[in-house]
Amino acid sequence: KISGIPENFWTDLDPRMLRQILNSVPLSGLPAADDLLLRALLAETLGDETVLNTRVQALIERGAVQAAYSLLGQAQIQSQEGFALFAETALLTGNVERMCRQLNLSRHLSDNEALKVYCQARFGSWNTAELNFFTLDTLGAFPPTLSSLLAVDLDPELADSLGLPNVEPNQLTALEFQLRAGAGQPVPTQGLPLKFVPSDLSPSSGWKNQIEAAERLGAVGSLPAAQLLERYKSGQPSASGGVWDRVNAVQNLDLTLADPIIDPSDE
């Protein structure tokens, strides 16, 4: 294998024990250790779906959501657990079309009625989505915050009249994160779990947000150092202190290394 990981690396493992092992692995910040773990988690190896789901969950928790999405995209998802992870990574990466079309065709893959409304509104029948939402909402199927977010998603004009409560970082779901962004009330990723941080790498995010997101992900090995360096070099800081001091330091070092070394003997 290109990864250097044996094909049978993940076979014959107890998923519960694997979960315990992965939970005990710290976010070390040691590049060699983080790189080895990520290569192992991403390796194309044999193993059942439960083991795959455990690996994907570990990737999500480390903020490697695009890698987790790609890994699941190569699998034949047959369980609700596997599809829940696929939906989470799709929402976190913005790659929702394939996931939603699959859910619209195979609704047994999820019991998440809010996700079904979300997907039906985008890649199915908007009228059906609206009918399902109002029916389920009348029956009390959605918590108040989620009900408001889905209502705004179906009718953006309600955004100004429906106030949303503050976010609980440890209770925020990928669907709510996307719905809040769509309602014009995006959730800042500072202080949120790592899985939400890659959204700030988008070109539409401010430069400062991109740098801080790249730093958080780079610190646990979920973003290549070259991509962090690219963001440090992508502009000129107009302020000082904090992140801007780091930007200046990196840019000055880069300029120094780029200068030709003058050999005194040539003078």
Where are these regions (language model features)?
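Alpha-helical solenoid repeat scaffolds
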Residues: 1-267
